[in-house]
Amino acid sequence: EDDHHHHHHHHHGVGGGGGGGGGG
């Protein structure tokens, strides 16, 4: 949820991590 400190591959296009998750 909080991509502010959780740089995971969420469904939030907030950074490269988000993009990577979408591709996967």
Swiss-Prot record:
It is found in: Secreted. It comes from Atheris squamigera. This is Poly-His-poly-Gly peptide 1. GO terms for molecular function: peptidase inhibitor activity. Residues 1-24 are annotated as: Disordered. Its main location: secreted. Keywords: Metalloenzyme inhibitor, Metalloprotease inhibitor, Protease inhibitor, Secreted. Residues 1-13 have a biased composition (Basic residues). One of its GO terms (cellular component) is extracellular region.
